[in-house]
A protein has these predicted regions:
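Active-site-proximal substrate-binding groove within the catalytic cores of carbohydrate-active enzymes
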Residues: 1-15, 33-59, 129, 136, ...
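Aromatic- and glycine-enriched glycan-recognition loops and surfaces
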Residues: 43-137
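Aromatic- and acidic-residue-enriched carbohydrate-binding clefts of CAZyme catalytic domains
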Residues: 85-107, 139-169
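Beta-strand-rich interaction surfaces with strong enrichment in secreted/lumenal proteins
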Residues: 416, 461-462, 524-528, 537-542
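Non-cytosolic beta-sheet module surface loops
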Residues: 429-432, 529, 542, 555-557
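Extracellular carbohydrate-recognition regions
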Residues: 478-510
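Extra-cytoplasmic beta-strand recognition segments
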Residues: 496, 534-557
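Extracellular glycan-recognition surfaces and repeat-rich motifs
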Residues: 497-531
């Protein structure tokens, strides 16, 4: 069957055009399962386990969730577990219920799922439905794909040699049952399934119908569907890795660059071309942003924690803010000439985008210049109900939702401040912030720090703060949530994330033991400059009799 919708002027611009049709189309279109969560998942990243090394056990990932919760003052998170099963990433494929024992097994995974809820962290797993490996119990002759000459069609070979499968055969011979096995093993709480490489045809037909059937199998278990390619699975997917991971893969596959599609679905998915200037075209400062994904837990060797946080506030907070609204009006400018990636071409940039929410609040995003050679081409002004909340490099943006999208009580409503440049900026506060005083906090991995009481004068405040440093503003004084580190790990604060050594018994010169940051800003214990033995001890807890345990201690001895 088909649906048709007829509309009048839907965005009050006194004309009827494609934009009114796009607004009306939302009333009859499909909505990908889980789209409502997308706007609140601000801190996406990958936690990587590979080659039997168990670099990020499940409960260590939980500590990372707590750390980001503090550093972002409670923004929602999305953690993709690459290597949740078998011996890690790209091992044991097709046996989805084979939870990796070295990283904690089923028990620790379920603990992670349950305890992550408190922090608004949405967990997903990386799977493959296109190839299989010899260690998988589903590796058998019937499912393997062959070339016309009868030889096997090979896939990845960086560990065991993977062999591509026949996806159509798999559909008819047990794929759904494997999803059900995983659901039965983990129970409720897993948020999304990321299907790697699907769409490149290595397993045969990965077209629209086959992709929709795969997505329905996953949705049936209560999970969101996510995919690798920027254009893949548009009907069902809410997250596209290559669209979000801007430095991964080539510029030709970075996301959907259709203005019409983005107009309709900007609030529903992270599939759009983000800001990466060298790619040109839509990637040269899209007004609505686009998810920019970084990591600090091993994917692509990335371990720069501070870089992750800086990127999140520079790109992703405003991208997610816009997703709390729907696009209502889109104005293009005049074509500009761009030269990149070996070609010169004309590109028509969007100059103004208007968005609204169900309560009638209106956001207007305006590019400062139509001249591609002007620095202001890559700057925007953003207003909320006529009040400026971003001006070029700086924003002071209200955030009135918790990590799961629920409205915050008035005394917890806040504004995030971030500026890529140092210097003073002046802001008009909303009328309901007409206090004589407001409270500013510097955000760090210890949460809200360095409280400053600011005087509101004529409804305005002036901020003169550090560049590339996130801050948060409140009406009243705030405290940080209490964190219990390394739950279930038999030792308290295995990663020294608490910022203190008070949980350790120190013998010798305690002044020589301190927590320091690595080059990637990860916390480490350092004992240095001591003239006598310095030791730190802590009693292991929760150990069971007649049970073997392994202790891993990472040491940099120089």
């Amino acid at each position: 069957s088909a649906k048709v919708v007829i509309t009048e002027d839907a965005n009050a611009d006194k004309k009827v055009d494609w934009q009114d049709g796009a607004i009306a189309y939302r009333s009859i279109m499909n909505n990908p399962q889980g789209w409502e969560k997308v706007k609140d998942i601000t801190a996406y990243r990958i936690a990587m386990n590979f080659g039997s090394q168990a670099q990020n056990p499940f409960l260590m990932t939980l500590d990372g969730i707590k750390k980001i919760n503090l550093h972002t003052d409670g923004l929602g998170q999305g953690v993709l577990l690459k290597g949740y099963g078998s011996e890690g990433h790209d091992s044991g494929h097709l046996n989805y219920a084979d939870i990796g024992k070295r990283i904690g097994g089923v028990e620790d995974f379920k603990t992670l799922i349950e305890k992550a809820k408190k922090y608004g962290a949405h967990l997903g797993i990386h799977v493959n439905a296109s190839e299989t490996y010899p260690e998988s119990k589903y590796f058998n002759e019937n499912i393997l794909r062959k070339n016309p000459d009868g030889s096997y069609s090979y896939g990845w070979n960086w560990l065991d040699q993977g062999i591509n499968i026949d996806a159509a055969y798999d559909l008819a011979h047990g794929r759904l049952a494997r999803w059900e096995d995983l659901k039965n093993k983990l129970g409720e709480g897993l948020d999304f399934i990321y299907v790697d490489v699907w769409g490149n045809g290595q397993s045969g037909d990965n077209g629209a119908w086959a992709t929709h059937v795969l997505a329905k199998e996953i949705n049936k278990q209560g999970w969101r569907f996510a995919i690798e390619w920027g254009h893949g699975g548009e009907y069902d997917s809410t997250f596209h890795h290559w669209a979000a991971d801007l430095t991964y893969g080539g510029y030709t596959n970075k996301g959907i660059n259709s203005a019409i599609t983005r107009f309709i679905r900007n609030h529903q998915k992270d599939a759009w071309v983000g800001d990466y200037r060298s790619y040109g075209g839509a990637a040269d400062y899209p007004l609505l942003g686009g998810y920019s994904m970084k990591d600090f837990e091993g994917w692509q060797g990335r371990s720069d924690y501070n870089g992750y946080v800086t990127n999140l506030f520079a790109h992703d907070v405003m991208t997610k803010y816009f997703q709390h609204f729907t696009v209502s009006k889109w104005e293009n400018g005049t074509p500009v000439t761009m030269t990149d990636n070996g070609s010169t071409y004309k590109w028509t940039p969007e100059m103004k985008v208007e968005l609204v929410d169900a309560a009638g609040n209106k956001v207007v995003v305006t590019r400062k210049s139509n001249d591609v050679n002007s620095p202001q081409y890559r700057e925007r002004t953003v207003t909320l109900n006529g009040r400026v909340i971003q001006d070029g490099s700086a924003y002071l943006t209200p955030w009135n939702w918790d990590a799961n999208g629920k409205k915050l009580p008035t005394d917890k409503e806040k504004m995030y401040y971030f500026n890529t440049q140092a210097g003073a900026t002046t802001w008009t506060l909303p009328s309901d912030w007409a206090n004589s005083k407001v409270y500013l906090y510097k955000l760090t991995d210890q949460g809200k720090t360095e409280e400053k009481e600011l005087t509101v004068k004529d409804g305005k405040i002036t901020l003169d703060l550090l560049a590339n440093q996130p801050y948060v503003l409140y009406r009243s004084k705030q405290t940080n949530p209490e964190m219990s580190w390394s739950e279930g790990m038999h030792i308290y604060d295995q990663g020294f994330n608490s910022g203190t050594l008070k949980h350790w018994t120190i013998s010798g010169d305690a002044s020589k033991a301190e927590i320091v940051k690595s080059q990637g800003a990860n916390d480490m214990l350092r004992i240095q400059g001591n003239k006598e033995k310095v030791s730190l001890t802590q009693k292991l807890t929760g150990l069971k009799p007649n049970t073997k345990y392994a202790v891993y201690v990472g040491v940099d001895n120089r």
